[in-house]
Amino acid sequence: MGKAKAPRQLKDNEAKAVARTLRVSPQKLNLVASMIRGKKVNAALADLTFSRKRIAGTVKKTLESAIANAENNHDLDVDALIVAEAYVGKSIVMKRFHVRGRASRIEKPFSHLTIVVREVAEKGEAA
């Protein structure tokens, strides 16, 4: 006997992917996340491909995972997907000493990234 399956937290037309413990500050990651928020997934992938930010490759990989989850797990149409949510959370902060006995310490922040894609109806279609 196991626990009952938890109810799904997303709507039926949504899929999600999460990247945890990314070695980048939340502020820098949020710059890239806000760049794709609200866009169609094809446009978002193109923007991430040509972005010069270091973390853009990891964000692209997470977005591709969300698209694959939508297609394979939830049977959503890939061409009708938009990036509904892309938000960043704080993770751990790795601390170390400065070299040569300096008095302060270096803090290396980590982040979490969550991307939710949503299937939307095309505007040209009649219901």
UniProtKB/Swiss-Prot annotation:
GO terms for biological process: translation. Transmembrane segments: none annotated. InterPro entries: Ribosomal_uL22, Ribosomal_uL22_bac/chlpt-type, Ribosomal_uL22_bac/org-type, Ribosomal_uL22_sf. Keywords: Ribonucleoprotein, Ribosomal protein, RNA-binding, rRNA-binding. One of its GO terms (molecular function) is rRNA binding. Signal peptide: none annotated. One of its GO terms (cellular component) is cytosolic large ribosomal subunit. SUPFAM superfamilies: Ribosomal protein L22. It comes from the Bacteria. Part of the 50S ribosomal subunit. This protein binds specifically to 23S rRNA; its binding is stimulated by other ribosomal proteins, e.g. L4, L17, and L20. It is important during the early stages of 50S assembly. It makes multiple contacts with different domains of the 23S rRNA in the assembled 50S subunit and ribosome. This is Large ribosomal subunit protein uL22. It comes from Brucella suis (strain ATCC 23445 / NCTC 10510).
